[in-house]
Structure formats: C-alpha cells, structure tokens
Amino acid sequence: MPPKIDINRVEELMPVITRRMITPSRLRFNMASDDALNLLASFFAAQVKSRCQKVEFDENTTENIAKLADFITAAVPKFGIMLCGRCGNGKTTLMRAFQQCVNWLDARHHFEFLDDKEYGYRYKPNMKIVDVREIVQSAHDFDRFKELRAYPLLGIDDLGKEPAEVMNYGNLLSPVVELIEHRYTNQLFTFITTNLTAKEIGNKYGTRIADRFNEMLHVIIFKDTTYRH
C-alpha cells in the first residue's frame, strides 16, 4: 500500500509546531492604501524638492507610488521590493522617500503592531541604503559584509552595474549573490533598484537568484520616462 498523509492529523499538529517557530514579521504599513499613497507622495515630493527639482506627479509617477502603497499595506506582503526601469525615472528617489517614510513612522511607534510580545521581540525597521558596489567592496571585509547582509531593512541601489564575481586572496566570490541568498533564507526585507530586465537578471545572476526574486520581491516596472534635465 502506498504511503498516505493524514491531512487531518497534519492540520491538528501544524498550529502546535508553528507556535514554536519564530517567523520574522514582514514590514507593512498599518493603514489604508490611500493614506499610504499620500504619505509616500509627500516624502517623494520632499526628496525631489531637496535636489532643487520641480515636483511633478504625472501619471507614471502616481502609478508607481500607488503600486508601492498597495504592496506595503497588503495583509501579507512579500519581504522585498524591486523597482525596474531605465536611468533617471525616479527609482532611487522613491526608494529614499520610502526609507524616510519608514523612519518617520517608526519615530511615531507605528510598527509596534509587528512586535512579538510572547517572545519579547521588538520589530526594528532600521533601513540602510547602499550602492551595490559597496556590497562588492565588502567582500574584502567579512565583518562589514556580515553587517550588511543581516541589516533588518536593506536598500540596494543600481543592482547590475557591479561585476558578478570578484577575487579575494585567490578565491572567486559572488558577494551580491551570497548576500541575497542570506536575506532570502532569513526573510529579511530588501529594497532593490535596477536598470536590468528580468531576462538580464537571469543571465547575470542565474536562474536560482531569479527564482528567489520572484518569491521575495514585489516588482514595480517603471515606464521609459526620464526626469533628469
């Protein structure tokens, strides 16, 4: 007789088992999507203004911010975001606006609902943004690399412009791939901007990382518009 799984028994045991597992809280905003849209738009405008540029909420910009707002207010969001598109269309500006928005909400204790009081766990949404080349450079400083890969919220700007592999004392390393694998395994929130297409990501990092991205990242594709003058 072939083996058979007792579904009723599995459903009975699963809650007992999962209570003993500490699953990381996933970053989300505890508010309506429209409220998140207005909040993110305000921080986006502030970022643009800080660079002495004119703030324009055209259709593309509004749509991109709205998609981010929808994602970050979902009941069970993925544990990351990827903004894809050509240079100069606002990807980095939106990522920095998101970082400032998270910091502003955290200062007002917005994320206390993500604390796990049973285990005494406090959710700390500290977000750091690094240029992807800084990750490659950290391959020569393992303590720095460990710090980056374990950061609670990490923004990686301009993924794809770095060499896929680097040499360190005769060893061939893939620091970006290793960092992403670690963050995927530990469900750490990762925010990425890139000029690469999905196909180019697969070609550069391999199908394994492309598959990881599909599971961990909500992707927002920016249309071919540039705001740099």
Predicted feature descriptions by range:
Residues L114-T185:
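Conserved nucleotide-sensing/catalytic segment adjacent to the nucleotide-binding pocket
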Residues Q100-N103:
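Walker A/P-loop NTP-binding motif
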Residues M1-P77, I220, H229:
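A short, basic N-terminal segment
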Residues G88-K91:
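Conserved glycine(s) of the Walker
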Residues G80:
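Walker A (P-loop) ATP-phosphate-binding motif of ABC ATPase nucleotide-binding domains
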Residues L83:
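Hydrophobic anchor at the beta1->P-loop junction of P-loop NTPases
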Residues L94, F98:
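Hydrophobic positions on the alpha1 helix immediately C-terminal to the Walker A/P-loop
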